[in-house]
């Protein structure tokens, strides 16, 4: 019997499919020092670059292709990548013999989950968004359990072993350091407006920031992705990426945040009680960010502007209204907190430890 505790995590494509897994791993590492952690993802990918920063997680590259809902010539080649990914995952699992495989989303997560099913290895897939993406729909047919971030997602997984766990957030968000944002903004006394383009960067938000930063009396923090260079100007700081400690401080202590509406970002904003204006990503997506935002809008927990209707004047007016209307500001901040499950990382980690116990006892 394999008594060494090993767990494979898999997921990627964006930071929103990686950071929740890291949050779970951090909690597991804190609770049990005798677990080996592995991450299966694509070489040179977002997940590869992020996992490299965590020396206690072994990264193993697997091939995978994107499964599209629309016609594309790439579908013909990507289906073979998925098959190769399943085959490689099969032999990796046989070699390392993990007791559990945990998927955090993205197309790279499907081959390991399918391979785990073939080898009768316990597997769990976690859907971060309100409604499941294609990868999770596939994973749910093979996984032992399904974890969901929104209670409302239960309806998509009828006759399945589904558990509402919330979405794990990075440990740095539990106690943000106010000194960090003070240093980043050079101790500004102006309102702080932070604009995030997501882990891949968003051209529309980058252009928006450059167009409005000199039209509002505020300090702008701009996370731009890799398509722009980092810079610091008067009342403006731009960086391609901020580390977890910086992001936690920026989100907690900014007056207003303007962002895409990925599920991971929403949960981090909720943990901080942030005042957020969402500009959901629509083009080329399944509309998950629109639906993520809709459920917050219904609870008066955010403001939203559709990208197709986005204009400088509209966003400027919205920012000015928030900065001058304390009642509205407070309502938005208080209502978004309702979407934060404080014990999510701890809950999932303890569930996994119980799974280890059950597996080793059988």
UniProtKB/Swiss-Prot annotation:
<keyword id="KW-0131">Cell cycle</keyword>
<protein>
    <recommendedName>
        <fullName>UDP-N-acetylglucosamine--N-acetylmuramyl-(pentapeptide) pyrophosphoryl-undecaprenol N-acetylglucosamine transferase</fullName>
        <ecNumber>2.4.1.227</ecNumber>
    </recommendedName>
</protein>
<comment type="pathway">
    <text>Cell wall biogenesis; peptidoglycan biosynthesis.</text>
</comment>
<comment type="similarity">
    <text>Belongs to the glycosyltransferase 28 family. MurG subfamily.</text>
</comment>
<dbReference type="InterPro" id="IPR007235">
    <property type="entry name" value="Glyco_trans_28_C"/>
</dbReference>
<comment type="function">
    <text>Cell wall formation. Catalyzes the transfer of a GlcNAc subunit on undecaprenyl-pyrophosphoryl-MurNAc-pentapeptide (lipid intermediate I) to form undecaprenyl-pyrophosphoryl-MurNAc-(pentapeptide)GlcNAc (lipid intermediate II).</text>
</comment>
<keyword id="KW-0573">Peptidoglycan synthesis</keyword>
<feature type="binding site">
    <location>
        <position position="289"/>
    </location>
    <ligand>
        <name>UDP-N-acetyl-alpha-D-glucosamine</name>
    </ligand>
</feature>
<feature type="binding site">
    <location>
        <begin position="14"/>
        <end position="16"/>
    </location>
    <ligand>
        <name>UDP-N-acetyl-alpha-D-glucosamine</name>
    </ligand>
</feature>
<keyword id="KW-0961">Cell wall biogenesis/degradation</keyword>
<feature type="binding site">
    <location>
        <position position="199"/>
    </location>
    <ligand>
        <name>UDP-N-acetyl-alpha-D-glucosamine</name>
    </ligand>
</feature>
<dbReference type="Pfam" id="PF04101">
    <property type="entry name" value="Glyco_tran_28_C"/>
</dbReference>
<dbReference type="GO" id="GO:0005975">
    <property type="term" value="P:carbohydrate metabolic process"/>
</dbReference>
<dbReference type="GO" id="GO:0051301">
    <property type="term" value="P:cell division"/>
</dbReference>
<dbReference type="GO" id="GO:0030259">
    <property type="term" value="P:lipid glycosylation"/>
</dbReference>
<keyword id="KW-0328">Glycosyltransferase</keyword>
<dbReference type="GO" id="GO:0005886">
    <property type="term" value="C:plasma membrane"/>
</dbReference>
<keyword id="KW-0997">Cell inner membrane</keyword>
<dbReference type="GO" id="GO:0071555">
    <property type="term" value="P:cell wall organization"/>
</dbReference>
<dbReference type="Pfam" id="PF03033">
    <property type="entry name" value="Glyco_transf_28"/>
</dbReference>
<keyword id="KW-0132">Cell division</keyword>
<dbReference type="GO" id="GO:0009252">
    <property type="term" value="P:peptidoglycan biosynthetic process"/>
</dbReference>
<keyword id="KW-0133">Cell shape</keyword>
<keyword id="KW-0808">Transferase</keyword>
<keyword id="KW-0472">Membrane</keyword>
<dbReference type="InterPro" id="IPR006009">
    <property type="entry name" value="GlcNAc_MurG"/>
</dbReference>
<keyword id="KW-1003">Cell membrane</keyword>
<dbReference type="InterPro" id="IPR004276">
    <property type="entry name" value="GlycoTrans_28_N"/>
</dbReference>
<dbReference type="GO" id="GO:0050511">
    <property type="term" value="F:undecaprenyldiphospho-muramoylpentapeptide beta-N-acetylglucosaminyltransferase activity"/>
</dbReference>
<dbReference type="GO" id="GO:0051991">
    <property type="term" value="F:UDP-N-acetyl-D-glucosamine:N-acetylmuramoyl-L-alanyl-D-glutamyl-meso-2,6-diaminopimelyl-D-alanyl-D-alanine-diphosphoundecaprenol 4-beta-N-acetylglucosaminlytransferase activity"/>
</dbReference>
<feature type="binding site">
    <location>
        <position position="170"/>
    </location>
    <ligand>
        <name>UDP-N-acetyl-alpha-D-glucosamine</name>
    </ligand>
</feature>
<dbReference type="GO" id="GO:0008360">
    <property type="term" value="P:regulation of cell shape"/>
</dbReference>
